[in-house]
């Protein structure tokens, strides 16, 4: 689910957020982005 994406997904310094994005999409959200190295899902 969405909260597990925040814990599991690594957010790199230079905008690498593929892992976060994939996780959020699997959780049923539109996309995922990184904010201050934390994965955030966009419903």
Curated annotation (Swiss-Prot):
Lineage summary: Eukaryota, Metazoa, Ecdysozoa, Arthropoda, Chelicerata
Intrachain disulfide bonds: 5-23, 11-34, 20-39, 24-41
Coiled-coil regions listed in the entry: none
PROSITE patterns, per the entry: ERGTX
Free-text note on domains in this protein's UniProt record: The presence of a 'disulfide through disulfide knot' structurally defines this protein as a knottin. Has the CSalpha/beta fold, which comprises one or two short alpha helices connected to anti-parallel beta-sheets stabilized by three or four disulfide bonds.
Name of the protein described by the UniProt record: Potassium channel toxin gamma-KTx 4.9
Disulfide bond found in the keyword field: yes
Keywords carried by this UniProt record: Disulfide bond, Ion channel impairing toxin, Knottin, Neurotoxin, Potassium channel impairing toxin, Secreted, Toxin, Voltage-gated potassium channel impairing toxin
Keyword Cell wall biogenesis/degradation: no
């Amino acid at each position: 689910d969405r909260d597990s994406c925040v814990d599991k997904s690594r957010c790199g310094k230079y905008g690498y957020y593929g892992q976060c994005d994939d996780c959020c999409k699997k959780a049923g959200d539109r996309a995922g982005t990184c904010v201050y190295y934390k994965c955030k899902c966009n419903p």
